[in-house]
Amino acid sequence: MFQNSMTPLGYYDEFNCFSDTTFIIAAGAAGEIGYSRTAFWAADDCYYFDCSEMLLSRYLYYIFKSEQQYITSRVRKASIPRLSRETMEKMMISIPPISEQEHIISILDRFDTLCNDLSAGLPAEIEARQKQYEYYRDKLLSFKGAD
């Protein structure tokens, strides 16, 4: 169950949001953007977005993440910070064809994994540096044309 933070408040055997849903925290940690691969319960301080066949939820997540600064700037600062539903409803976004959305998602998911998943990102980085090392080592030690 998500309510006023990106940390689940708890776990519940029922849900009101299906898996692969983009959501935004509306109070407390207002403006924080999340994406859930599993079904969950969204409390009243959590806006979630039902996407149509024209808009993929993961694409919407990345759009919102790219607009994080704008969304955060729209949070009303008070004793409990709050983001209005109207702010989100008025946001204009570009919706390319599904195939392009899938391509964008694929690229951004891979980049996200490399940056945030140490078990995937670190080995890939180590492998890239190893290849770079071998390339420069071989170049330095080849002595071609040194006659």
Task: Specify the residue positions occupied by each region the protein language model found.
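Charged, alpha-helix-forming regions
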Residues: 1-147
